[in-house]
Amino acid sequence: MCYNEEVIKTTSTPRKVCMFSKLSSLKSYERKFERFHSNTPKPNEIELFNSLQKGIKEIETHLNLHPFDEQIIGAFVLASGAIAEMKTGEGKTLTAALTAIMTAKEGQVMIVTVNDYLAKRDYELLKPVYEACGFSVGLVTHAQTPYRKKDAYTKDIVYVTNAELGFDFLRDNTATSLEARVITRPLHRAIIDEVDAILIDDARTPLILSGKGTADVSDARYKQADATVVALKDSYIKKNAKTRTVTLTEAGHDFVQNKLGKHNLYAADNVLTAHLINNALKARFMERENIEYLIKRGKVELIDKMGGRVMDGRRYNDGLMQAIEAKERLDIQDENKTLASITYQNLARLFKHISGMTGTAHSEAREFKDLYNLEVIQIPTHEPLMRLDHEDKLFDTQRDANAYLLRIVDKAIAQGGQPLLIAADSTRRAEALSRLFTEEKIVHSLLTARDASKEAQVIREAGRTGSILITTALAGRGTDIKLLDENAKRLGLFVIGVGRGQSKRVDDQLRGRAGRQGDLGQSIFLVSKEDDLYNVLDNPQLTRSGEIKWALYTPDYVQKMIEAKDYDSRKNTLEYDDVLREQREVIYQLRNRILENKDLQDVATTAHEFAKRAHADVKQLEALEHALNGTLTAKRFRAIQLQILDDNWSDYMKELDYIKDTMSYRSYAGRNPLIDFQQEASKYFGEFLDNTRKDILEALITIGNIKTKPRRLPKKNTSMRQFTKAKFK
């Protein structure tokens, strides 16, 4: 017997549950489920199986679907707080639903998806199931009003995108009243779909809540920085494609200083100039049109290289976007003002329980364990995999690769119209292939980040006989290509990667479009030495004829180099954001205290506290308290405090970004940039808190018509330990 009889009686699918312990690929994970082997079942265990049984029954009733064994196994993995690696077409939607039904009585469950379309689709599909199980369910989308969002966030089970959840969290922590907040329940459990895309690929880019900034930097200065960089000789710069950095050589440093009339470019009073030059260098040499970004209707739109889609509404902060606009001779938009920011890594840490699903997590198992303490469990496929994965074809030039591609296309057409999915490594490459196919009179469709609005329609037809779709990595995730006719099913989908991606996971996601649920299919990658993948090599060993040595630099080897670099980058992002994390918690807790002050006694007490900390004298304190008791309402005092605190916090974050931008140069002097940043952030945070209190006191004195002013604050180093959460309790 594999489970206690009493527990088995609570479910109509004992074979499915028992099967869990028989799968050899999951043996190492069996200890997570020892609680189910108890001779005397605990009440919560019986409740878990009762919930599972109810969920299966309602799915059968309302959807006419019966969950596979593997989906139930996946649900147990998610419920235990791990990552379930499930291949394309294996039913992650029902797996997440079963997990939510099993765990929603413990606390709210958020099912986090990568886009509104998936969130809405799954919400509408499963709403009757959840309600039949006794749970309320909500949907949060970008287009909703705050009132509708607030209502949705009160539900037991909530569907929401990762971006919307993150921005709602940031907006709540910049709200000017408690009523304006939309997330009102504790962050209990998150089930993250495409967990590697959210916690790995997006981890390097913080979520930034921006407001309208002021024109602190003139257009002329952006243009001057760009013109200075354009004038640099090759010997004046050092590019590292592996780390995506560009730095000035000593000669380049001297050239820029002379051209701009600066004595020391990296002196404290030249930090803005250095920042502008650094951004201009990156814009010129690392940000490429139709690869990192595209230009649409006179605007720069950023491309997610891992996902191939335009990142709607996302702009680089800290002046890099303006540097690109100067480079492209576009209208330079005002730099946004950062109101609040957080990484997805630290957003995930706010939940008591997190788990996730994806088709490709095993290669990043170490990072999931190190950064999130999440184990990755591979779930077997329901049907045997029938896809044939061919060895890579290697070519010296992209022209040779294109010629081979045309031969594959001709053969597919001759065999009866085998559907082809051709995925290029960039928008630029996909558009070039489309022009080639047009010249060759090959009927095809093109889908890139430029026209992703028609994605659903194009993907829907990609599994039809005779279909040839040229696209990018955007077809590799969040799409399900179904074979639509008997001939297509007989031949199977053929996935052709033109160039390897920056990560093996991207390639595996692409391969996974073929061979879903036991379908026939094939995949192959055509790789050349001219591909973007090989731009990361820094001084590679060459043959006598000056070509890259394939034996030393296989695509797999180069991908591992990139993945190692990306891991270090994500870890670095987290380390720097951790410096801000404790400070952010202090500020958010302080804002909560301000928002929760409800009466005039709180106003006077809090004003008195601020005044003492801002070094006011006894007469000032007495005059201030007397004036406030007669002239200031609680609502107005809250508004004053919040406006000053938020404005100063925004300026503080901007200053830290400038400091962080120049930290890499500290390593040249044998110093540790992270330690330097921690020390300077600690110092400036103490000064920020003192100056904020002073600014609030000055505002209160002005309102109270008090003639005296607070004493000038002393500048001092402030230990981070002095500003823990306990300080404001």
Language-model region placement:
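Extended, charged helical/alpha-beta scaffold domains that provide interaction surfaces
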Residues: 294, 298-301, 313-314, 537-539, ...
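Conserved P-loop NTPase motor core
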Residues: 2-3, 7-544, 588-589
